[in-house]
């Protein structure tokens, strides 16, 4: 596994799983619940340590920590604490399973995860999905989606993006021209061309293609996608382009729109804050401040409340004002 160092949550030291398990049991035993203790422990330990705490909790008390959290806590705060307890290994597979379960498909989750994860991460998600749920993720997704949106999801699921290496300028020029002809210069749009190029070329190659495209056409590739496509395909193509440019900037924007305007998309807020907390949340905070003229910390503070807010702010790990 790649070693990530840009997270806000790191291994806590000195760590004592038994002491943490005892403190959590005490916080939930008897009348009332000590939410403060729960949120302080769970947001300051990394995911591997949380699994050790759960194991110690089972050994000491014969109880399931997640079940106890579910019975003692409620609402968004409960969802956040339970998400923090989910083993990192299965986090994405679990989110995808729930995105394609029951009535209606949550295209937003499919888009966010499959556009932003590396090929190695996607391969891992597919394996975990099969192990945990005894089902083929690609089959499940194709059963719930259709059209060009489905085609691009399938391409991304193959995790066959070219590895980064020396960029061939002739191929950059060719791809930029082909994209221009497939969209702006054509009556209608050749979606397959966008899907193939954006779904399979290397990150460094595509960054050059986007620059070249701007030179040739006078448009940012995002403007063309916006004009030439619509619906779920448009959202997925845009997410892929944004992640090719910068994954932290993509997540900064995702977090911003989860809180902007009336109401909050708490599912997205929780999913991103938890899943990126040990990977690149420091970089996401930096991009957030740069692109939205306010800090992620301030926006969370303004948009949420109670123990839920306290826990999110601890995960955020600091203000960038």
UniProtKB/Swiss-Prot annotation:
GO terms for biological process: calcium ion homeostasis; negative regulation of coagulation. A pair of annexin repeats may form one binding site for calcium and phospholipid. Keywords: Annexin, Calcium, Calcium/phospholipid-binding, Repeat. Annexin repeats lie at residues 15-86, 87-158, 170-242, 246-317. This is Annexin A5. GO terms for cellular component: calcium channel complex; cytoplasm; sarcolemma; vesicle; vesicle membrane. The gene is ANXA5. It comes from Gallus gallus (Chicken). InterPro entries: Annexin, Annexin_repeat, Annexin_repeat_CS, Annexin_sf, ANX5. It holds the Pfam family Annexin. It comes from the Eukaryota. One of its GO terms (molecular function) is calcium channel activity. Gene3D superfamilies: Annexin. Collagen-binding protein. The keyword Repeat applies. Belongs to the annexin family. PANTHER family: ANNEXIN, ANNEXIN A5.
């Amino acid at each position: 596994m790649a070693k990530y160092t840009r997270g806000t949550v790191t291994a806590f030291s000195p760590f004592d799983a038994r002491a943490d398990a005892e403190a959590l049991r005490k916080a939930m035993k008897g009348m009332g619940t000590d939410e403060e203790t729960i949120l302080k422990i769970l947001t300051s330990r990394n995911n591997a340590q949380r699994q050790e705490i759960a194991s110690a909790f089972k050994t000491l008390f014969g109880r399931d920590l997640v079940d106890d959290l579910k019975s003692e806590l409620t609402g968004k705060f409960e969802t956040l604490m339970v998400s923090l307890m989910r083993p990192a290994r299965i986090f994405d597979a679990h989110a995808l399973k729930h995105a394609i379960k029951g009535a209606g498909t949550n295209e937003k989750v499919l888009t966010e995860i499959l556009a932003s994860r590396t090929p190695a991460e996607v391969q891992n998600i597919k394996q975990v999905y099969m192990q945990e749920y005894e089902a083929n993720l690609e089959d499940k997704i194709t059963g719930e989606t259709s059209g060009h949106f489905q085609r691009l999801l399938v391409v991304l699921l193959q995790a066959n993006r070219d590895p980064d290496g020396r960029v061939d300028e002739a191929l950059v020029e060719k791809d930029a021209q082909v994209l221009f002809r497939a969209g702006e210069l054509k009556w209608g749009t050749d979606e397959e061309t966008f899907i193939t190029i954006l779904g399979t070329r290397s990150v460094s190659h595509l960054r050059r293609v986007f620059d070249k495209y701007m030179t040739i056409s006078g448009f940012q590739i995002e403007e063309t996608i916006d004009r030439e496509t619509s619906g779920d395909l448009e959202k997925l193509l845009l997410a892929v382009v944004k992640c090719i440019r910068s994954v932290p900037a993509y997540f900064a924007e995702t977090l911003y729109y989860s809180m902007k305007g009336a109401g909050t998309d708490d599912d997205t807020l929780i999913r991103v804050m938890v899943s990126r907390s040990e990977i690149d949340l420091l970089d996401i905070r930096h991009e957030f401040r740069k692109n939205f003229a306010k800090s992620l910390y301030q926006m969370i503070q303004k948009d949420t409340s109670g123990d839920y807010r306290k826990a999110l702010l601890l995960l955020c790990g600091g203000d960038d004002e």
